[in-house]
Structure formats: structure tokens, C-alpha cells
A protein has these predicted regions:
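Active-site metal-binding motif and surrounding structural segment of the metallo-beta-lactamase
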Residues: 1-34, 121-127
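Helix-loop-beta element that forms the nucleotide-linked donor phosphate-binding surface
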Residues: 42-56
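Metal-dependent catalytic neighborhoods of phosphoester/phosphodiester hydrolases
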Residues: 18-27, 170-179, 204-205
């Protein structure tokens, strides 16, 4: 990896905060931005204090020509049996002179999206979770129809669905979030970008991207008729 100006963290769950990854990134990263308490974990892992900034909801910082604001999310935190909700979780607003971006982190659908939209929107691109959803935990992860509504609440121009295709945290198929959000987006006239993991996109002019998950050689997708070869 090249030198990295900053790393944004949303909360301390293992699928979002990996100790080995953080330690490997330290030599490359100028600044880690984290919600309250999460930065303390980085310090405990040996990250130099000068590289860590912790923010409460609605606090902002200027770095590298950007203004970054920690904004509310509806989720929870903790890494063990006895440390539940001792650290904060958040979403992020990222603003430059030309662009406004929103990163949801993990969140259930709540009226905070509309408030963030009123304060900071409209957004050129919203990066919103759609994945790991289930009817039994609607307050901490969004279903695709809620992701679409959050995008509209925020005043988003392009939607980039995140929190999918990696860790298997729910009962749905790994590719289902992509299919469902694209179906809903087509129905409601919402522009969606689905870059393959590791693929770059031009934030000034996002592209829809191909349905790459249908090309993955995987027994699960082949059963559903999406597999290749």
C-alpha cells in the first residue's frame, strides 16, 4: 500500500476493527479518526498518540484539506462479554471543496439520517450498509429498503452499498444485498455504484459497475443461477 493520509473507524466490533490490520497500517498512516473510546483501544495496541484523534457525535476535524464530522448511528459496541457499549459508534460526513460524502458505518434505520441530511446534505455519494440484515435485529442493521430510504433522507446523488459480500453474519446469501438493492434502486430511479472490492471509482463521476458477484465461481451462486462457467 502507498502512504495513507487517514483511516476512518466507525466502531470497535471485530469485523470493523482488527488489531493485526491496525498494527500493520501504523507505519503507513498519518492519522486514525475514531469515535470516543475506540481511539483508546488503538493507543493500547501501541499506536502513537499523535496519530489518533477521537471525536464525539457532531464534532469535526480538518485534515488534509477535508472536514470530517463524526455523526450519529444506531448500533452498539464491544469486543467481549463485559465491555458492551463502553465505546462510541458513529457514521461520518466527509467534505472537500468539491464533494460531500457520507459513510454510515454500521447502523439500523433511524431518524438521524434525516437530521444529518438537513445539517450536511445533499451528498454526492452515500456509502450505506446493506448486508447482515435480519428481521430479528432491525435496530442495528438495515434491510435494503431501509438503505434506500436512508439514501433519500440524506439527499444522496449516488448510492454505494457497503457491509456486504465479506463476513457471513446473517442467514441471507452473500450476494442477496446486491441483487435486492439494485432491484429497488431501479424501481425508484436511484443511481447505484457497485465496484468490485479493490476497484477504484472516480468520486466526481461514479459509474454503475458490472454485476461482478454473478461472475464469482461459487456453489451458492451457481445454485441460484448466477454462477459462471
Amino acid at each position: 500500500l502507498p502512504p495513507i493520509r487517514g483511516v476512518i473507524l466507525s466502531h470497535d466490533h471485530y469485523d470493523h476493527l482488527d488489531r493485526a490490520a491496525i498494527k500493520a497500517l501504523v507505519p503507513l498512516v498519518e492519522l486514525f479518526l475514531a469515535p470516543l473510546g475506540v481511539g483508546d483501544r488503538l493507543l493500547a495496541w501501541g499506536v502513537p498518540p499523535g496519530k489518533v484523534r477521537q471525536l464525539d457525535w457532531w464534532q469535526d476535524i480538518e485534515a488534509g484539506g477535508l472536514r470530517l464530522t463524526a455523526t450519529p448511528a444506531q448500533h452498539f459496541s464491544g469486543r467481549g462479554l463485559h465491555d458492551g457499549n463502553r465505546t462510541l459508534w458513529c457514521s461520518w460526513v466527509i467534505e472537500s471543496a468539491e464533494l460531500k460524502l457520507f459513510f454510515s458505518g454500521d447502523s439500523g434505520y433511524f431518524d438521524g439520517f434525516a437530521e444529518i441530511g438537513r445539517r450536511y446534505g445533499p451528498f454526492d455519494l452515500t456509502m450505506l450498509e446493506t448486508g447482515a440484515y435480519n428481521e430479528h435485529w432491525p435496530y442495528v442493521h438495515m434491510h435494503p429498503q431501509q438503505t434506500l430510504q436512508a439514501h433519500r433522507d440524506l439527499g444522496g446523488r449516488w448510492l454505494l452499498p457497503i457491509h456486504n459480500g465479506t463476513f457471513d453474519l446473517a442467514m441471507h446469501a452473500w450476494y442477496e444485498p446486491f441483487e435486492r438493492i439494485l432491484e429497488l434502486a431501479t424501481e425508484h430511479g436511484v443511481r447505484v455504484s457497485t465496484p468490485m472490492m479493490g476497484e477504484r471509482i472516480d468520486l466526481q463521476a461514479p459509474h454503475a459497475g458490472r454485476r461482478w458477484w454473478r461472475e464469482v465461481v461459487d456453489s451458492e451462486t451457481q445454485v441460484q443461477g448466477y454462477g459462471c462457467c
